[in-house]
């Protein structure tokens, strides 16, 4: 199972009281439900591809309204041939929609009804229902951090974005071809959202993966930095050795001043060590890194003069 499927399975096992159950069911039906007329009778169909979500819808309707509900299973014919689960109720359909704030005076309302988000627990429950209906979250082990909730109706999606941001989640809203999404891109905010809607097992897994990824990224940055510094050190050392070899060939190291002769011989003999380590090997006593660099720069300048044919004065 995917990370998102595991999370939805966890969410469907949360116990809620009646007001929170209504808030959750309101989001589920508003986003995945449809009202139709069959044999002069109104019918509510709520569709999902997740079996545990279908069972959740079934149990919430039975519990709150005590009406008969059936679950139909259809096979999806396009692309992935997943099952589609349809929860259907033919009893008190308009009354159910009216009580859940979805139907008012015979007209469908696409905004989030205020009666469904009266307090903190109901707001959390509504967001949980919205995620069960249209939510997805990337597997944190294999891709970038991303959580979204899709809704067919732009004003409902904007309402979800606003509701998420009432908890400081920095959610963004984006229009898509067949609807709109409210989404999160920050790992910390995704963690907060998982906690907010009760996905605590998913939160623990997400945080475990996040810690490992952050550590791996930190190590990679450190290794890259160390590698870059090492490459610079090796490149500089190679140039210094080339300059010293040219001076040896054209002038002879014994003709150099003592301080330059000693550092030249040390560099050729110890090409792999740092400037600091070279400075600690000076016979008259340790000198600083900048002091070593100054002497080596003098040797490079001398070699450049030899290459350009300038007059050499020692």
From Swiss-Prot:
DNA-binding region: 274-308
DNA-binding is among the record's keywords: yes
Record InterPro entries: Homing_endonucl, Sporu_reg_WhiA_N_dom, Sporulation_regulator_WhiA, Sporulation_regulator_WhiA_C, WhiA_LAGLIDADG_dom
Keywords on record: Cell cycle, Cell division, DNA-binding
Top-level division of the source organism's lineage: Bacteria
PANTHER family given in the database record: CELL DIVISION PROTEIN WHIA-RELATED (PTHR37307:SF1)
Function: Involved in cell division and chromosome segregation.
Protein name: Probable cell division protein WhiA
């Amino acid at each position: 199972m995917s990370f998102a499927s595991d999370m939805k399975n966890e969410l469907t096992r949360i116990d809620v009281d009646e007001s929170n159950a209504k808030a959750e069911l309101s989001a589920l039906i508003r986003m995945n439900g449809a009202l139709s007329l069959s044999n002069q009778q109104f019918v509510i169909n709520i569709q999902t591809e997740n079996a545990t979500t279908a069972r959740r819808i079934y149990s919430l309707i039975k519990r709150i309204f005590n009406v008969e509900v059936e679950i139909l299973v259809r096979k999806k014919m396009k692309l992935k041939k997943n099952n589609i689960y349809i929860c259907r109720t033919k009893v008190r359909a308009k009354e159910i929609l009216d009580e859940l704030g979805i139907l008012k005076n015979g007209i469908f309302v696409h905004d989030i009804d205020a009666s469904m988000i009266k307090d903190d627990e109901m707001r959390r429950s509504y967001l949980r229902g919205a995620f069960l209906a249209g939510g997805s979250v990337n597997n944190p082990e294999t891709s970038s951090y991303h959580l979204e909730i899709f809704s067919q109706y732009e004003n409902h999606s904007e309402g979800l974005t606003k509701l998420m941001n009432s908890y400081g989640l920095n959610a963004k809203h984006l229009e898509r071809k067949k609807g709109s999404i409210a989404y999160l891109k920050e790992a910390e905010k995704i963690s907060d959202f998982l906690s907010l809607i009760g996905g605590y097992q998913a939160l623990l897994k997400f945080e475990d993966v996040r810690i490992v990824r952050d550590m791996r990224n930190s190590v990679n940055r450190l290794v890259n930095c160390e590698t870059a510094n090492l490459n610079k050190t090796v490149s500089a050392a190679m140039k210094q050795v080339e300059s010293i070899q040219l001076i040896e060939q054209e002038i002879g190291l014994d003709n150099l001043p003592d301080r330059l002769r000693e550092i030249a011989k040390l560099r050729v003999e110890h090409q792999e060590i740092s400037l600091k380590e070279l400075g600690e090997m000076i016979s008259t006593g340790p000198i600083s890194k900048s002091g070593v660099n100054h002497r080596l720069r003098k040797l490079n300048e001398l070699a450049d003069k030899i290459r350009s044919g300038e007059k050499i004065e020692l």
